[in-house]
UniProtKB/Swiss-Prot annotation:
The gene is ORF73. Belongs to the protein kinase superfamily. Ser/Thr protein kinase family. Residues 81-90 have a biased composition (Acidic residues). It comes from Ictalurid herpesvirus 1 (strain Auburn) (IcHV-1). The keyword DNA repair does not apply. This is Protein kinase ORF73. It catalyses: L-seryl-[protein] + ATP = O-phospho-L-seryl-[protein] + ADP + H(+); L-threonyl-[protein] + ATP = O-phospho-L-threonyl-[protein] + ADP + H(+). The lineage of its organism: Viruses, Duplodnaviria, Heunggongvirae, Peploviricota, Herviviricetes. Its EC number is 2.7.11.1. ATP binds at residues 307-315, 324. Keywords: ATP-binding, Kinase, Nucleotide-binding, Serine/threonine-protein kinase, Transferase.
Length: 962
């Protein structure tokens, strides 16, 4: 007879054994689904393939309950993870007849060995049916993921807890009616369900899908967390505030139709209720994009030498300029790449600094979609970038190397120059986001080498933003949780300067190796907690980081075999810190004794942009994009205009950028959030406008010209008395799209004309046939409330001061390309600031004026005279001066006083506006200075009561103030 001794195979299964009746407890094996997920993620990322059996067996946690085998004679014991225990059990095992099949992965499965039974043998199994009972399972930790968490680490813990809960629910072994058809030991001597094994790919796919959903939601939570302190990109900007355009159709509220414009509450600006935005045409008025003249001289780039190539485009040499050609590619995480390159041009045009490269001209070729777009920008051209400079023979060790003292002096110059450029950006709330040696350019001026920051394509605004730039220069917070701030620029600057001194970055290597080095020398994850999965899940948090008081740069230098001066080492220790809040700023470093030598800044002078513009080509010809219409990106019109980004003290000077749909929006200015937002307002509060809050009502006579039926001015107690809410009931025939164009024109002139009433927010609404407009402005009073008969403190007649202001208003309009019309002198639209001196400054409400008088053409740049009361066919300047003179005399109870001070005959002799201002009695009159207006915090929305005012509907309005 054949030997029936049980044989043990390498996989731990017993062969040549009869199928036995297995009495098994109802406790199913507990599976560690995190290990399943980690293995599948590793396989997806190119790791070794894992089979279904090994996957489930390797992730199964032994259940301490005993398993009783029936008449087969197998030993009764607890399942163990130890192979030694299995061998001991096999030593005492009895003989068996029929082999138990060895289960393989699904792709290698063969038909299982079936047991032949006698026909008279009943097929009903005698063993109990397996039923998974939750009460007999190992206690499962259930995480409460519904509560609010205080830290990012709590959110991560909750996400992993939710993942564990979902995986346990989805991936439990499926019970089979009538019991398992076969039950056997699998790898590592654990119970394996063959049906579950066959269904494992489906289960794992379900696990993977669910994990991806949770991961996406978690990433969205992280994105939302960064957005909490990030300024939302609005659609249109104004003097002193921001327009956010909302439209309500009936009572339905729809989200903004603007990419990457999600409104999230934050400490910087509150969240408006999102409404459906009226679509506007690209390149509308105020976009700073103008079509160049036909037949302008052009340059063909096919003959231009190539300076470099990158993912976004190519840089050519055109004369003494660098021509950057960028294509509008939509990348992951970038909603509108072409808007970014246009923004770079507009940013460069407004950043005038000796250590930032000068922008010269910009051109845009735009088609029907964003991918059909090319942005061409001309910049001043330097010698080379800093990386190429440090690769020259005189910088590298060897016989041709320059003197070490000269080398260290040049490095100090470059350090200070780049710090000055970063200070200029950070003071304006801007992050460079891509500081590296390739983006620092070397110039010569008066025999001196000058370093300048370039490549502003990644430049961003706000307190925090998503990661951008080059990974080798990323700080730990960017590597771990994918955010950047101004302190991230300082880290990248430190890495760059380390590279200049040593020839290599301090934390070289791959992503994970680089992170390990960062944490090793600056403090961070405990080694037991650090793993690839944690990094992939952005699991870094301050609570889990053992931050070192001072980075261990000595150990880093010893390991890298480099030697640095003590002063430079101290600088590096102040910027290469794990906690961004502990890093020194550019302003802090510039106070260091290392940079006090004034000779370090010799040759640092602002480039004369006008001289570069004279030699720049009028147009760049792109033959491969002939089907795209060219447009020119226009800079500031006034050549003597100061850097608007530096105008901190004037509330009206708001720097501009271009959003995704090419409408300008203000750059984030941190001083507005700190100082200008009044503390007397409560954010996220409902404002109800009741009849008790009504200050004044102006019924408008119904004529064909007027588009407004009624004007109401509210001053609710929740608002400071320095602000008004204006409600305009519009005619049903009014065109919302025309009003949108009007507001885009108004925002452009509010930025540059101090005589326009600033509008902090406006909303257009419709309910049935009712149409309305609500906007928030500073409190104002009609000019008729002024006392024109008195005198100022210096004895000047008040009427003469008003007259000079009116003429100055006309001059300001003319300088901005607007034909001032005489019927703007109207009591309904001229106001003065009640918080200032008694006589002004005067303000013109362009919104009411345009809707009252210019409904046929709501383009403020196309105003034409419609006042036929003045029949003087003379010069428009004379008409304007005489109209203002007549208006002031009508408001004065003693008009002869004005005649004595400023005779009408003298005004009639004026042929230019300058002639009026040269009148001796007018020349000495001083106009009151414009006052700084604090922008209030945003209320969540504004509600009009009673609702029957708009035929039973409810009006909601909200906006962004900055």
């Amino acid at each position: 007879m054949a030997d029936r001794t049980p044989k043990r195979s390498a996989d731990g299964l017993i062969h040549d054994a009869k199928p036995s009746k297995v009495t098994k407890n109802d406790r199913p094996p507990v599976i560690d689904f995190k290990r399943i997920l980690a293995a599948k993620i590793a396989e997806k990322r190119g790791g070794p393939p894992v089979s279904a059996v090994s996957l489930i067996a390797a992730s199964t946690v032994s259940t301490p309950a005993p398993v009783t085998y029936g008449s087969v004679g197998l030993p009764t014991r607890q399942l163990s993870d130890s192979d030694d225990d299995d061998e001991e059990d096999n030593a005492t095992a009895k003989t068996h007849s029929v082999p138990i099949p060895v289960f393989k992965p699904p792709d290698q499965l063969t038909a299982p060995h079936t047991v032949k039974r006698k026909p008279t043998q009943p097929p009903t199994p005698t063993r109990p049916v397996h039923q998974a009972q939750a009460t007999q399972r190992r206690p499962v930790v259930s995480y409460d993921t519904t509560g609010r968490r205080a830290t990012t680490q709590d959110e991560i813990t909750d996400a992993f807890g939710e993942l564990d809960n979902e995986l346990r629910r989805l991936a439990a072994l499926t019970p089979v009616p009538g019991g398992w058809p076969e039950s056997t030991r699998g790898e590592r001597n654990q119970m394996v369900n063959p049906v579950g094994v066959k269904e494992l790919p489906i289960v794992v796919q379900s696990i993977t899908d669910r994990a991806i959903q949770i991961e996406n939601r978690l990433e969205a939570q992280f994105h939302g967390a960064t957005e909490m302190v990030k300024t939302v990109v609005p659609t249109v900007s104004v003097r002193g505030g921001v327009f956010t355009r909302h439209v309500i159709t009936d009572t339905k509220r729809q989200p903004f139709l603007i990419e990457a414009c999600e409104f999230i509450p934050s400490m910087i600006q509150e969240a408006p209720i999102p409404f459906r935005a009226v679509a506007s045409k690209p390149f509308a008025a105020g976009t700073k994009l103008l079509t160049p003249k036909a037949g302008a001289p052009a340059v063909d780039l096919r003959a231009a030498p190539v300076l470099g190539k990158g993912y976004f485009g190519t840089v050519y040499k055109v004369g003494n300029l660098a021509c950057k050609v960028q294509h509008g590619r939509v990348m992951p995480g970038v909603s509108n790449a072409i808007s970014d390159v246009v923004e770079e041009s507009l940013l460069g045009s407004r950043l005038q600094h000796p250590n930032i490269i000068t922008f010269v001209k910009g051109f845009l070729y735009h088609g029907a979609v964003n991918t059909e777009a090319v942005c061409v920008s001309l910049w001043e051209l330097g010698l080379m970038d800093l990386l190429s400079f440090t690769q020259q023979s005189f910088w590298q060790p060897g016989k041709d190397a320059c003197d070490p003292l000269v080398k260290r002096y040049l490095a100090r110059r470059f350090e200070k120059h780049t710090l000055l450029g970063l200070e200029h950006l950070h003071e304006r709330g801007l992050m460079h986001r891509d500081i590296k040696s390739q983006n620092i350019f070397i110039f010569t001026n008066r025999g001196r080498l000058v370093a300048k920051l370039g490549d502003l394509g990644c430049c961003s605004k706000g307190a925090f933003c998503d990661a951008g730039g080059t990974r080798a220069y990323f700080p730990p917070e960017t590597l771990a949780i994918n955010v950047q701030c101004c302190a991230s620029d300082m880290w990248a600057w430190g890495v760059t300067m380390w590279e200049v001194h040593t020839g290599r970055t301090p934390f070289w290597g791959g992503t994970d190796i680089s992170m390990q080095k960062v944490f090793r020398y600056t403090g961070g994850f405990d080694n037991r907690a650090y793993n690839q999965l944690a990094v992939a899940r952005h699991a870094m948090a301050a609570a889990d980081s053992a931050v070192k008081p001072v980075p261990d740069l000595e150990g880093l230098m010893e390991r890298g075999k480099v030697s640095l001066s003590p002063s430079f080492t101290d600088i590096m220790k102040s910027v290469l810190r794990l906690n961004p809040n502990d890093r020194a700023t550019a302003s802090d470093l510039l106070k260091s004794p290392r940079y006090t030598d004034e000779s370090l800044t010799e040759g640092c002078e602002c480039t004369d942009r006008k001289s570069l513009e004279k030699n720049a080509p009028e147009m760049i010809r792109l033959l491969e994009h002939n089907h795209l219409p060219p447009q020119k990106v226009i800079m500031t019109t006034d050549p003597h205009e100061r850097d608007q980004l530096a105008e901190k003290e004037r509330w009206g000077q708001v720097p501009m950028e271009v959003t995704g749909d090419f409408r300008p929006a203000p750059l984030y200015m941190p001083w507005l959030a700190r100082a200008d937002m009044g503390d007397d307002h409560t954010a996220k509060k409902l404002i109800t406008l009741t009849p008790r809050d009504l200050v004044s009502v102006y019924p408008v006579v119904a004529t064909k010209e007027y588009g407004v039926k009624e004007i109401r001015v509210y001053r609710p107690p929740e608002f400071s008395p320095t602000y008004d809410i204006v409600y305009l009931e519009l005619k049903p025939t009014i065109d919302f799209e025309a009003i949108q164009s009007l507001m885009e024109g108004i925002q452009a002139i509010q930025k540059s004309i101090p005589y326009v009433v600033p509008v902090f927010h406006y909303t257009l609404g419709a309910h049935g046939t009712k149409r309305y407009m609500i906007y928030v402005t500073p409190a104002k009073r009609s000019i008729t409330e002024l006392n024109f008969d008195g005198e100022t403190d210096d004895g000047t007649l008040l009427g003469a001061v008003i007259l000079k202001q009116l003429i100055s208003l006309a001059v300001a309009f003319r300088d901005n390309g607007i034909n001032f019309i005489t019927n703007m002198y109207n009591t309904h639209i001229l106001y003065h600031d009640p918080r200032g001196v008694d006589i002004g400054p005067l303000k013109l409400d362009m919104v009411i004026y345009m809707l009252l008088h210019q409904t046929n053409n709501l383009n403020v740049y196309k105003l034409s005279s419609t006042d036929r009361t003045l029949r003087d066919p003379g010069d428009p300047v004379l008409k304007t001066c005489l109209a203002a003179y007549t208006y002031v005399k009508l408001l004065m109870s003693a008009p002869r006083a004005l005649e004595r001070l400023v005779p009408k005959t003298t005004i009639s002799a004026c042929k230019r506006f300058d002639d009026f201002f040269m009148i001796p009695t007018v020349k000495k009159i001083s106009i009151p200075p414009d006052t700084k207006i604090k922008v209030p915090k945003l209320f969540s929305f504004i509600k009009i009561e009673p609702p029957q005012d708009i035929s039973g509907g409810t009006v909601y309005a909200s906006g962004t103030l900055s």
